[in-house]
Amino acid sequence: MKKTYRVKREKDFQAIFKDGKSTANRKFVIYHLNRGQDHFRVGISVGKKIGNAVTRNAVKRKIRHVIMALGHQLKSEDFVVIARKGVESLEYQELQQNLHHVLKLAQLLEKGFESEEKH
């Protein structure tokens, strides 16, 4: 994922948490904030309660892969994806479905893409 598509600075994370809206399902929480940019930016957070470092990094890679696959469908907003406990045991397909579901709930998918079948 290119650096321009990442939320990296603590200040940006805090602004999204403070001023953004949140949406959740059983496996993910998403905070999002529209800042008027021309593309989306994403930050991924996987807490220490979820496995060891290897497991957390694997979860982050899977989330990043799903986000990039959905990239053309995402609205131009900043958002932070927080993984909840239990996400580490999901297969890729289940993780993709859960993430797609919470993005749809947060209305972060462009019109016309929400009704598309999941891969």
UniProtKB/Swiss-Prot annotation:
NCBIfam families reported in the protein's UniProt record: rnpA
GO MF entries: 3'-tRNA processing endoribonuclease activity; ribonuclease P activity; tRNA binding
The protein's Enzyme Commission number: 3.1.26.5
Described purpose of this protein according to its UniProt entry: RNaseP catalyzes the removal of the 5'-leader sequence from pre-tRNA to produce the mature 5'-terminus. It can also cleave other RNA substrates such as 4.5S RNA. The protein component plays an auxiliary but essential role in vivo by binding to the 5'-leader sequence and broadening the substrate specificity of the ribozyme.
Pfam families per record: Ribonuclease_P
Oligomer status and interactors: Consists of a catalytic RNA component (M1 or rnpB) and a protein subunit.
Family affiliation: Belongs to the RnpA family.
Organism: Streptococcus pyogenes serotype M1
Name this protein carries in UniProt: Ribonuclease P protein component
Keyword Lipoprotein in annotation: no
A GO BP annotation: tRNA 5'-leader removal
Coiled coil: none
One Gene Ontology CC term in the entry: ribonuclease P complex
InterPro entries reported in the protein's UniProt record: Ribosomal_Su5_D2-typ_SF, Ribsml_uS5_D2-typ_fold_subgr, RNase_P, RNase_P_CS
Record key words, sorted: Endonuclease, Hydrolase, Nuclease, RNA-binding, tRNA processing
Catalytic activity as recorded in UniProt: Endonucleolytic cleavage of RNA, removing 5'-extranucleotides from tRNA precursor
Domain of life (superkingdom): Bacteria
